[in-house]
Curated annotation (Swiss-Prot):
Is synthesized initially as an inactive proenzyme, which is activated by self-cleavage at a specific serine bond to produce a beta-subunit with a hydroxyl group at its C-terminus and an alpha-subunit with a pyruvoyl group at its N-terminus. This is Aspartate 1-decarboxylase. Its EC number is 4.1.1.11. It comes from the Bacteria. The gene is panD. Catalyzes the pyruvoyl-dependent decarboxylation of aspartate to produce beta-alanine. One of its GO terms (biological process) is pantothenate biosynthetic process. Coiled coil: none annotated.
């Protein structure tokens, strides 16, 4: 049996832009994607700490070092620049893999610069 397990998150990032007219997705600074081991086009959940909204979308790469967390498309109705969010990724793992999984937690500062990688 496979289990769906939490495997990585970017914790308490700040939304820097919201573009209602973009087709969809979330644009994330490539440095943060690398730190969290999230791939371009990978499904992610976004949990808005500021207002409680939650959604599923997919990740796009933003410029390295930019700190960009850009909410695109219809999701821009749910999240605004300045909102604090958690961006999480999950994966399917065998029973054995699930029991030894060590998720990555990427902690960022107010400008979405990497502060620390922290295991759960």
């Amino acid at each position: 049996m496979e289990r769906i397990m939490f495997r990585a998150k970017i914790h308490r990032a700040t939304v820097t832009q919201a573009d209602l007219d973009y087709v969809g997705s979330v644009t994330i600074d490539q440095d943060l994607l690398d730190a969290a081991d999230i791939l371009v086009n990978e499904k992610v959940d976004i949990w808005n700490i500021t207002n409680g909204n939650r959604l599923h979308t997919y990740a796009l790469s933003g410029p390295r070092g930019s700190g960009v967390i850009g909410i695109n498309g219809a999701a821009a109705h749910l999240m605004r620049p300045g909102d604090m969010v958690i961006i999480a990724a999950f994966g399917n793992f065998s029973e054995e893999e699930a029991r030894t999984l060590e998720p990555k937690v990427v902690l960022v500062d107010a400008k979405n610069r990497l502060l620390e990688l922290q295991p759960v």
